[in-house]
């Protein structure tokens, strides 16, 4: 059960980091413009953009998960 949850999270994180989304960064606001609350779409966009910067960590996590699958969750 816990192995399935860890595998699901790993695959989801890989999908977000590897897929090449054409996301644009949010425009910066100039003087005199009121700041608004970020929408859900803005939050998702920022999360996917931040995943791109963590590709090395994600690769190390994948190696760790493969080790766990062989040693701990293997039958």
From Swiss-Prot:
**Where in the sequence is the signal peptide annotated?**
1-17
Membrane topology per record: Single-pass type I membrane protein
Give compartment(s).
Answer: Membrane
Cytoplasmic side stretches: 75
Upper lineage is: Eukaryota, Metazoa, Chordata, Craniata, Vertebrata
User: Which PANTHER family does this entry report, sorted A to Z?
Assistant: SMALL INTEGRAL MEMBRANE PROTEIN 7
**Its family?**
Belongs to the SMIM7 family.
Q: According to its UniProt record, where is this protein mainly located?
A: membrane
Q: Spell out the protein name for this chain.
A: Small integral membrane protein 7
